[in-house]
Each structure stands twice: as structure tokens, then as C-alpha cells.
Amino acid sequence: MYDWIFNHVVDFLVLVLVSYPIVGGIAFIISSIYQRVFNERRQLPAYFDGEPPFVSIFVPAHNEEDSIESTIVYLATQLNYPDHCYEILVINDGSTDATGEILSQLQVRFPSKLRVLTVVDNRGKAHGYNIALGYARGAFILSNDADTKPETDALWKYMSYFKREGGQNVGAVTGNMLVSNRTTLTALVQMNELNSIVGMIKRSQMAYGGLFAFSGANTMYRKAAVFDVGGFQAEQPTEDIAIAWDMQTNGWQALFAPHIRFFLDMPETLRAMFKQRRRWASGGIYVLLTKTGALLKHPIKNLATMPIIIDYAFSIV
């Protein structure tokens, strides 16, 4: 009797594990198409009238001498947003290369636009962001990596989600990643991945009503929402995943805006790509293990995120 039950349970589990990638893939495709056709066009916000809110752009920098100057000059001169309505805060996180010297020169060039916060020892992005929150003048924070350039209208487009009707519940909006360095086969493969698979996954998650993660490279946060969840979790390997879960657990909306584009450099070697993906995977697993309990305490309130949790758990298995 027990053998019969055991064998049938094993057969059922094997069937689930074998069929899930197929069934899950079909569900992702259908839900992403539904999101794009029926929801995105209706939700696409228009530009708003009136004085735009002040935005603080956070740029984390640890040994970024190759890209920091280009990024800061772009942010200071190319964004289509009133100059008096945004600032750039660079967190120089224990850099040992020429990053500090370059930033000093840029401060002379952009004295009213650029501020630099120096962290003596490298403590990570989340730690630097939590320090910068105490200096930020803006009610909204744009997280922007040192090798990332958002499209020129990005600030207007991001802010339109917060300013639209019902936008007071929006905690963060993440944009659409595009690859800027396309010189190696590894980078080209990742370009195709971001343009198709990642966008489809985020659209599918939005169809269910939530997001598994924000993009650490370019996301706009409501500062009040960041404070509401206790800031960025420095102990988490991937703070962008952790804060997405924290915000949604506390009732804030997390949105994906596919029409807001930003361009970033991706790893150009298989070794570097593997290191990046391993960090993403370990961060996702860590968040799953540490945050799922809080979501399950209120399953009805967090119903929209349950399919995302289940999918990620099965993906790990």
C-alpha cells in the first residue's frame, strides 16, 4: 500500500517537474502578449503639466574610471528635464583607481549639478544608497549604474507614472534594458536575451500584478516608499530584488515601463557573464528564502505575487 502511494507520488512529482517548463513557458508567452496588447497601451501615461518634481540621481561607483566620466557628462547635459529639477549624487564606494580624481574634475565642471559622497571602504551598493538617502534633495530617486545611460526623456516618462491618477500608490518603476556594447558574441547574445526573454518575463509578471525584481541599473523609486521598507537591504546579495519584494509586501505598486529605455554595458566575456548570473541567481534564492514567509502571512493581500514566487521556486528545482 505504502509502496503504491510512494510510487504514484514520485510519478506525479516527476510529471510536474518535466511538464512545468513547457506549461510555464506557454503561460509566460500568453500573459506577456495579453499585457502588451490589452494593458500597456491603456496604461501608457501622457506627459503631465506643471512643475516637475525634483529627482535625485544616484550613481554608485566602485573603480569605474573607464565609464564614470561619460555617464556623468551625459546625465548632466543630455537629459530632457529642467536643470533646476534634478541633481546627481555619486557614491564613490572605496574606489582604488582614478575614479575619485575624475569625479573631482567633474565637480569643477558641474558645481551646481554634481555632488560626490565618498565611502572610504567598499561596502556595496545598498550601503552607499542608504547613506545617499540622507543627502538627497529629491522626493524621487533614480538609481543609475555608472555604465548606464537612460534615454533623454526618461525622467519625464518615469515621473508620469507617479503623477498619473492613482500614482500615489506607485513605489517604483523600472525601465527596459538595452545593451550598448555589442562588440563581442557574448554581448550580442545578451542583447537578444534582454530584447526578447527578459522583456517577456517582466510583461508576464505585470499581467499577474507584480514584479520579481527591479533593474538595478535604472529604476526610479519614490523616496517615501524606500523609507517605508527600511531602505535598501545591505545584507542582501541583490538589493534590487529585495526592495521589490519589500515594497510589494508593504502594499506599494511595482511597475515595468517597457517604453522607457536605458542602455548599459553587459559582460563581454563568458567568465564575467557567469559571475554576474551567479550573483543574480544567489540573490534571487536568498530573497526567496528570507522574504517568502512575510508574503505567506497575508496570502490574500499578496495574491498577485504568488504565481511569481511559485514560478521562481520551480525554476530553481
Predicted features, each with a name:
Residues 1-11, 34-48, 208, 268-317:
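Basic/Trp-rich segment in TM-proximal cytosolic loops or flexible interdomain/linker regions
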Residues 1-66, 70-73:
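N-proximal low-complexity "stem/linker" segments adjacent to membrane-targeting elements
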Residues 34, 111, 117-118, 124-128, ...:
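Long helical/loop segments within the catalytic core of UDP-sugar-dependent glycosyltransferases
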Residues 53-56, 87, 242:
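Cell-envelope/extracellular polymer assembly enzymes that use nucleotide-activated donors
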Residues 69-70, 97-106, 153:
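Acidic helix N-cap motif at the loop->helix transition within catalytic regions
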Residues 73-85:
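Short, acidic, metal-binding catalytic loop of nucleotide-sugar glycosyltransferases
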Residues 92-101, 121:
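A conserved acidic beta->alpha catalytic loop
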Residues 141:
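Short aromatic/hydrophobic "clamp" motif used to bind/position activated sugar donors
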